[in-house]
Amino acid sequence: MPLLDRNGWKAEAFDIVALEDLDAALAAKAPEQKLGVLVPNNIHPRALAPVQDRLDLIAVEFPRHSDGRGFSLGRMLRQQGFGGTLRASGHILPDQFGFALHDGFDEVEIDEAQAARQPVEQWLHARALISESYQRTEDGPATIFQRRRAAR
């Protein structure tokens, strides 16, 4: 499935396993192997805390574009200290791309049909449209309220 980050399309660089296969994959992991896990959007981030430092990627499933739990999970994983690549996988819309990046995701994975319908330029344009934030974000820009307070 196509992958997209803030710069455009990119190639897959990870071996990704299902959550139920994670223990076996970690036990068999080669030193140079980049290992990731695909998790549902309703998992509690603490369930990944014991192994997150051994993972290079966590891919969070987005089963429907109207289900925003994955955004919250991504933010909580970053707050918990996960420093690897964070991927939103599944039903993401271009309009949600900027929000995913603000919540700590590094990349999104969409299906081939969506990639054909919505070219990379549409995704990058949608990302650029979100220039202001009312809430603190994981990617650092000051919020509208922080800038207003600093200007006083």
Task: State what each model feature region is.
Residues 1-40:
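Non-catalytic interface/targeting segments
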Residues 3-11, 41-43, 53, 122, ...:
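Phosphate/adenylate-binding glycine loop and adjacent helical scaffold
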Residues 31-37, 76-88:
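Short beta-strand/loop segments at the ligand-binding rim of alpha/beta enzyme cores
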Residues 85, 94-96, 108, 112-152:
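Alpha/beta catalytic cores of nucleotide-metabolism and tRNA/nucleoside-modifying enzymes
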Residues 25, 65-76, 116-128:
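Active-site-adjacent beta->alpha loops and helix N-cap segments on the catalytic face
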Residues 28-30, 46-55:
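Acidic (Asp/Glu)-rich catalytic clusters
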Residues 46-50, 94-107:
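Catalytic cores of alpha/beta
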